[in-house]
């Protein structure tokens, strides 16, 4: 089974993604900010991270940089940002 970490500060988004992905048989882990995501990755084998860019404490970019220090797990950003200057 593949484990997916969903990291978003909006509980409704985490819940919606969790319901959708868990129904396909993925192991789902939740984090509500960057620090929680990093802690979860230290304790659990994660195969994919779905992460919001705008979060309190550590934003998605800062969190990804920290994740990259120890892991090459794929990170997919989810965001409401839509302007050209917001592109990563």
Sequence positions of predicted segments:
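Two-component/phosphorelay signaling modules centered on CheY-like receiver
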Residues: 11-29
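Acidic, metal-coordinating helix/loop segments flanking the phosphotransfer/catalytic sites
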Residues: 30-48
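Acidic catalytic/metal-coordinating carboxylates
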Residues: 32-36, 59-62, 86
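Receiver (REC) domain active-site loop signature in two-component systems and cognate sites
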Residues: 55
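Alpha4 helix (beta4-alpha4-beta5 surface) of REC/receiver domains from two-component response regulators
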Residues: 62, 69, 73, 82-88
